[in-house]
A protein has these predicted regions:
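Transmembrane beta-strands of outer-membrane beta-barrel pores
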Residues: 4-10, 22, 33-37, 59, ...
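Face-selective signature of the C-terminal outer-membrane beta-barrel domain
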Residues: 63-69, 103-250, 270-272, 327, ...
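Surface-exposed extracellular loop regions of Gram-negative outer-membrane beta-barrel proteins
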Residues: 74-91, 189-198, 242-249, 257, ...
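Transmembrane beta-barrel wall of Gram-negative outer-membrane proteins
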Residues: 6-35, 40-78, 101-122, 170, ...
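Membrane-embedded beta-barrel scaffold of Gram-negative outer-membrane proteins
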Residues: 15, 20, 113, 122-140, ...
């Protein structure tokens, strides 16, 4: 196939993809070239090249594939801007403070997968190696720290990840009941070189820190599904994860080694179906990992003040109860309520562009998802969710989690198999969010409406028009609240909402031919 797209704001896209028989198997290939400026005063000039090449051979009973993927891009970044500068007319919504922000990225990967299945067993092995290299330039506080050169900083990162996954599943019986058991192992090794540099117009001024990091993780798991009765089954699992961190920093005090391990049990109880309806209860434990550098840190590399270390792995516990039903013809619905606790919440720092380990947190929520296909040519997806997110400890600053979305909803309709016509329309809503812990500053809600309509000119040729932000909403994609300083302000700057707008209304045209 060949696909060519053009649109407003410098949008250009070309895609070539296909597959053919080769050496007893199948060779798949694809190449994408992409450019977009966006609606910003200084265009993003986002250039991207994507390529994939995959050779596969075998059947469902056994086979393998080898895949190579390459991705490279470069862009200008219009980062979040202070609301006060838009309110007083200094900037428009699509302006920037530091026009030299941006970055370059590349990602190359090579992977292989093998599987072998019999009537009662299934074995899978896959491995991959990925090299990521990026260099990002950002300036979120403008002139707060350095009134002469500005606060731009660079985050160079070069990492190679190597991973091996293997699993074996078999059917059998447990206490005379039909049962399936899976055992598996996952091994990952990351070699990372990164840093934090002070820059001006992408030129290095000084070095805050440089680090060489080696992170090794091993996870082993066992999962069993047993059908105890016609309408009752369980899924029981246990996983053990071990992480080893080694950091060699340009600041000797921040070098070191540490390790951590956690066991994560999980249990699911599934009842039914009755009248095409199932009920389920899930409970379990998991974790998130922290930045390896934080596990051995001793001093703040920027201020020189003593710094607290963070645990390598942070415990998470959760439970969920739900119902899945198809009792209404052509409608699949799921309703669930859940609770999720973290021993330490990962908080994104809008003024630094980094995450930090925060206070213990809890989320309690409800989700309702629906997939409805009233006719062969119309599909409707409707989802709504609400979550109450709070810190669990007591602190005078407040209990709200900055940036935690409280309510989200989406409604989408797609049309196909309606003669030569096809299309889709999607509405999405993200509710207001607290921006600081005491909830005194909140973002507004974000609403988008996107759509597309197409016509099949012939059996192998189609044309499609896409529209983005059809209501031309002035919503924000992100909002943060922190201190920054503009050139005409005092040394302490001001606390303010900083936002990045969603893109303005735009249209694109795509022509696709299949051979």
């Amino acid at each position: 196939m060949v696909s060519l797209g053009v649109g407003e704001n410098g949008y250009r896209r070309g895609l070539v993809a296909g597959s053919s028989a080769a050496v007893g198997g199948n060779l798949l290939y694809a190449l994408e070239i992409f450019h977009n400026d966006g609606p910003f005063s200084k265009g993003d000039n986002y250039r991207k090249i994507n390529g994939v090449l995959r050779y596969s051979r075998g059947t469902e009973a056994g086979g393998f594939n080898i895949t190579a993927i390459a991705y490279t891009s470069a862009y200008n970044a219009t980062d979040q801007i202070p609301k006060r500068a838009v309110d007083d007319g200094t900037l428009n919504r699509f302006s920037s403070i530091d026009s030299t922000d941006g970055g370059k990225v590349h990602r190359y990967s090579l992977s292989a997968a093998w599987h072998q299945n019999t009537e009662n067993t299934a074995t899978k092995v896959n491995a991959y190696i990925i090299n990521n290299r990026l260099r990002i330039y950002s300036n979120f506080t403008y002139f707060l720290d350095d009134p002469v050169n500005g606060d731009q900083f660079a985050q160079p990162d070069n990492r190679t990840d190597m991973t091996l996954n293997a699993s074996h599943a078999w059917k059998g019986s447990l206490f005379g009941r039909l049962s399936e058991t899976t055992v598996g192992i996952q091994i990952q090794r990351d070699a990372i070189r990164n840093g934090l540099l002070s820059t001006k117009a992408r030129q290095e001024l000084s070095e805050t820190r440089r680090d060489r990091i080696k992170e090794t993780s091993v996870g082993a798991y066992l999962e069993n599904t047993t059908h105890w009765a016609e309408k009752f089954r369980t899924v029981v699992g246990i996983r053990e994860d071990y992480y080893k961190f080694a950091v060699h920093s340009s600041l000797d005090a921040n070098s070191g080694r540490t390790h951590a391990s956690l066991a994560s049990p999980k249990l699911s109880l599934i009842f039914g179906p009755w009248a095409k309806t199932e009920f389920y209860l899930n409970a379990g434990a998991g974790f998130h990992s922290n930045d390896a550098r934080g596990t051995v840190i001793a001093i703040d590399p920027k201020s020189g003040d003593p710094a607290d270390r963070v645990p390598g792995l942070v415990r998470a516990k959760g439970a969920e109860a739900g119902i899945r039903t198809e009792i209404i013809p052509r409608l699949q619905s799921t309703l669930s309520v859940y609770g999720l606790d973290f021993a330490s919440e990962l908080i994104f720092q809008g003024d630094a562009g980094t995450t930090s380990a925060g206070r213990p947190s809890r989320r309690v929520g409800i989700e309702f998802s629906n997939y409805y296909k009233p006719t062969d040519w119309l599909t409707i997806d409707a989802d709504i969710a609400y979550a109450k997110a709070r810190f669990r400890d007591v602190d005078p600053v407040g209990r709200r989690i900055p940036g935690a979305v409280e309510g989200v909803a989406s409604l989408a309709a797609s049309v196909d198999n309606l003669g030569p016509y096809f299309g889709a329309l999607q509405f999405r809503y993200f509710g207001p969010r607290p921006l600081i812990e005491d909830n005194s500053v909140r973002s507004k809600s974000t609403t988008t409406l996107n759509g597309r309509a197409g016509y099949k000119v012939g059996p192998n040729v189609s044309v499609e028009v896409e529209g983005f932000n059809l209501l031309n909403s002035k919503s924000s994609a992100i909002d943060y609240y922190y201190q920054s300083r503009l050139p005409n302000e005092g040394p302490n700057g001001e606390n303010d909402i900083h936002f990045h707008p969603i893109e303005s209304r735009s249209a694109r045209l795509t022509l696709t031919a299949r051979f």
